[in-house]
Amino acid sequence: VAYLFSYKGRTALISGDTTKSANIQAFAAGIDLLVHEALSNTLVSAMHDAALAVGNLPRAMIFDDIHDYHTSPKEAAEIARDADVGHLLYYHVVPPLDVLGLEAVWLDGVDDIFQKYTLGQDGTSFSLPPNSREIIKTKSKL
């Protein structure tokens, strides 16, 4: 699922929890801002293995299942590149990147695909001035 918003010549699309989708890419074609969720398969797989190692099978099952309904950071970058969007904002970042160094692992390979992105945090916001091509990050975090 995704939501497409257009106003005064500007367009943004917000994805829901979803795997890489040709429909989202089609609706995102040429838009100004793609707001896309993403999950690091590398980090979540490590969490799965850690849960198994300590015998937490319910948690391991969750970490295994969530791959089925999330897009990876690289897949979201591919959508942004192939749809020729103005900017990609990652939101609903899984897992939370609350330990130093995780951001680099989460973003691994993204720069090789699409460079006009922001890794969102709570409070990140953008402005799309009417009838222009300008994309302005107005706030980086709370």
Place the predicted regions along the sequence by residue.
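Cap/insert and terminal regions of metallo-dependent hydrolase folds
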Residues: A2, K8-T11, T19-D122
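Binuclear metal-dependent phosphoesterase catalytic core
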Residues: L119-L142
